From Swiss-Prot:
A single GO molecular function term of this UniProt record: rRNA binding
Source taxon at top rank: Bacteria
Record's keyword terms, sorted: Ribonucleoprotein, Ribosomal protein, RNA-binding, rRNA-binding
Described function: This protein binds to 23S rRNA in the presence of protein L20.
Organism: Frankia casuarinae (strain DSM 45818 / CECT 9043 / HFP020203 / CcI3)
Similarity comment: family membership: Belongs to the bacterial ribosomal protein bL21 family.
Protein name: Large ribosomal subunit protein bL21
GO cellular component assignments: cytoplasm; ribonucleoprotein complex; ribosome
Assembly notes: Part of the 50S ribosomal subunit. Contacts protein L20.
SS bonds (residue pairs): none
InterPro entries recorded: bL21-like (IPR028909), bL21-like_sf (IPR036164), Ribosomal_bL21 (IPR001787), Ribosomal_bL21_CS (IPR018258)
Keyword Ribonucleoprotein assigned: yes
Keyword rRNA-binding on entry: yes
Length: 105
């Protein structure tokens, strides 16, 4: 069973036990986080109805904060000798998915 969840404007395919890096979330390591499910695949059935997904709970545990890949920016203006080099590394939150609970009894 796996689910597609939304976090930070992006979508991630997760299953129980997966470790995923998402945009920075507030929370200390060890804190529990609930993620909204957009799609649920359970064996042969696929659920994408918003009403049915309201009862689906995807829980994850904050593992820590990591840095993303280095992005290099270079600005250049012609005929002036102007060069500007800059770098950036986005902070990401590493989550470990602990459970995907459906509302079925």
């Amino acid at each position: 069973m796996y689910a597609v969840v939304a976090s930070g404007g992006k979508q991630h395919r997760v299953a129980v036990g997966d470790v995923v890096d998402v945009e920075l979330l507030s929370g200390e390591p060890g804190a529990a986080v609930n993620l909204p499910a957009l799609l649920l695949v359970d064996g042969e059935s696929v659920t994408h109805d918003a009403d049915a997904l309201a009862s689906v709970a995807v829980t994850a545990e904050v593992v820590g904060v990591v840095k993303g890949p280095k992005i290099r920016i270079h600005k250049f203006k012609n005929k002036t000798g102007y060069h500007k080099r800059q770098g950036h590394r986005q902070k990401l939150t590493r989550l470990k998915v602990t459970g995907i609970e459906t509302g079925k009894a």
